[in-house]
Amino acid sequence: MEKLVIATRASNLALWQAYHIKERIETAFPEVRVELNEITSKGDKILDKPLALVGGKGHFTKELEDEMIAGNAHLAVHSLKDVPTYIPEGLELCAITERQDQSDVFLSHTYKSLSELPEGAVVGTTSLRRRMQLLEKRPDLKVKDLRGNVNTRLRKLKEGQYDAIILAYIGLYRLDLLKDIPYVEKLDFFIPPMGQAALGIEIVANNDRIREIAMTLNHEPTFICTKVERDFISVIGAGCSAPVAVNATMDKKEDDKVPTISVRAMIGYPDGTHILHKSLTVPLNEADILGDELAQAMIEEGALDILEQAEIIAFKDEMPERL
């Protein structure tokens, strides 16, 4: 029997994702026995400050990649939103699983919705992207950093450290945690980050058998859409924790029309000001250039200056009060 080793983070959500992939592989390839190599990433260890203030990239992926390069794992399962656009030599982002619900959700034990939060209410989030979009909509709120795994964040909410918090819907759904929260509201006005709600399958590049197995996990429409998002991020030069939102979708095909793909993006300061929105739609056969085109269009409108200033704001000790 063949053995295949999956590198995974040791958090509850990461393990759910890894076991999900393990089950899919063993079902499709009964001759393969899958083992998990559980690893604690740098991002899991840094709990005293926002990752946006740490600098660098790959906080949740580098240790898994090191295990593959060292020969201790054949593939790694990542939340795609955590995977930098640069993949180390000798590795390959081979497959992307079908994307599920990308929503960000408002969670509270006291208030039914974002609109019901009073002025000055405290909202918890780790993400500069969420902070940016929240404060653009509700500049009267106070946003505080929220670290820890999903269960830790929910505990802090229940203890009353926050009036509300914002998390990704998909993690709560996968861990069956939505039933424990009285008030849940999907924030439809939020644009998600690159790759949210999809899994990235990274492999050792010179192993054709592992590639054959991994490719059975790939969902081509999701692969195309997330490539547009990753191309955009690569050209803009933003890291996974920058205040940048981008989302590509394939448009519903009408019988008499050429299929199209659309992408929308948003860049701004973490305090919800200096926001730049833009979207583009092209025929599906031009998807390979769509991310680059949108990035270049936003650069022409000042995106790089906005990102530079956003980084300065995020790193300043005397951040604005609402940060």
Curated annotation (Swiss-Prot):
Catalytic activity, reaction form: 4 porphobilinogen + H2O = hydroxymethylbilane + 4 NH4(+)
S-(dipyrrolylmethanemethyl)cysteine: residues bearing it: 240
GO MF entries: hydroxymethylbilane synthase activity
EC numbers on record: 2.5.1.61
SUPFAM superfamilies, alphabetized: Periplasmic binding protein-like II, Porphobilinogen deaminase (hydroxymethylbilane synthase), C-terminal domain
Pathway: Porphyrin-containing compound metabolism; protoporphyrin-IX biosynthesis; coproporphyrinogen-III from 5-aminolevulinate: step 2/4
Domain of life (superkingdom): Bacteria
InterPro entries for this protein: HemC, Porphobilin_deaminase_cofac_BS, Porphobilin_deaminase_N, Porphobilinogen_deaminase_C, Porphobilinogen_deaminase_C_sf
Alphabetical GO biological process terms: protoporphyrinogen IX biosynthetic process
Cofactor: how bound: Binds 1 dipyrromethane group covalently.
Recorded family membership: Belongs to the HMBS family.
Role: Tetrapolymerization of the monopyrrole PBG into the hydroxymethylbilane pre-uroporphyrinogen in several discrete steps.
Further comment: The porphobilinogen subunits are added to the dipyrromethane group.
Entry protein name: Porphobilinogen deaminase
Originating species: Sulfurovum sp. (strain NBC37-1)
Gene assigned in the entry: hemC
